[in-house]
Amino acid sequence: MPKQDRAIRTRRTILVAAASVFEEHGFQAATITDILNAAGVTKGALYFHFQSKEDLAYGVMAAQGRHMGVVPPRACKAQEVIDTVLLQTYRLQKDPMVRAGVRLAMDQHASELDRGTSFQDWGKGMTLLLDAAKEQGELLPHVVPSDTADLVVGAYAGVQSMSQAVSGYTDLNHRTSVLLRHIMPNVVQSSVLTTLDLAPERGAAIYAEIQALMEAEELAGASA
């Protein structure tokens, strides 16, 4: 295996292990020793890629942000807003990296970390989608895209936190669908609202769609 590929795999292994430890113990209680044991790598290998526990936490949060990804484009930009939320819901239930990133962002005891970046980045992405929706005439006249983006991100943070505490995310699909059904009628035109798909199971379908697109791109790249 080429040295660069091996380094990438090692870094990924360390991040996955760190995500597992942070998800289980939180930032303060997690230790480098716990992460080393979970990763099965040497201390030298870990410190080659990450200089500290804080550095590891930022790596997990950055990976979580990338895993949120960008949903496939839709003619209706309001649907893209919904798809972004539903995709995050699916990944929270299925991906330990996403769960760990969210736990770190919500961890009030992790005072050493800049926890606001995750929320701000998601809010910026939501604002761009809502700006596009406004340009297409999909939004009600009173809607300010940046304000609505902050509302969606903040409300979702609370809903997912409650779901994690109450059911370990098993009811997150339902809670997310309820949230969207209450928010969207106050955001989009009635003619747009009737076209939106808010089904809880849509997140899994979006994830499968993204995976299929990625596989097609890889095949195209391999045959080029």
Predicted regions and their residues:
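Basic, helix-initiating cap at the start of DNA-binding domains
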Residues: 1-25, 29-41, 51-58
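Key DNA-contact positions within bacterial/archaeal DNA-binding proteins
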Residues: 44
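Short, Lys/Arg-enriched C-terminal cap helix and immediately downstream tail that follows
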Residues: 58-59, 187
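Hydrophobic alpha-helical connector segments
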Residues: 59, 69-98, 149
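Conserved phosphoryl-transfer catalytic core
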Residues: 64-67
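C-terminal peripheral helix-coil segments that are non-catalytic and often amphipathic
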Residues: 79, 83, 91, 124, ...
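Short secondary-structure transition hinges
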Residues: 88-142
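All-alpha amphipathic helical-bundle segments outside canonical DNA-binding/catalytic cores
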Residues: 117-118, 135-151, 167-175
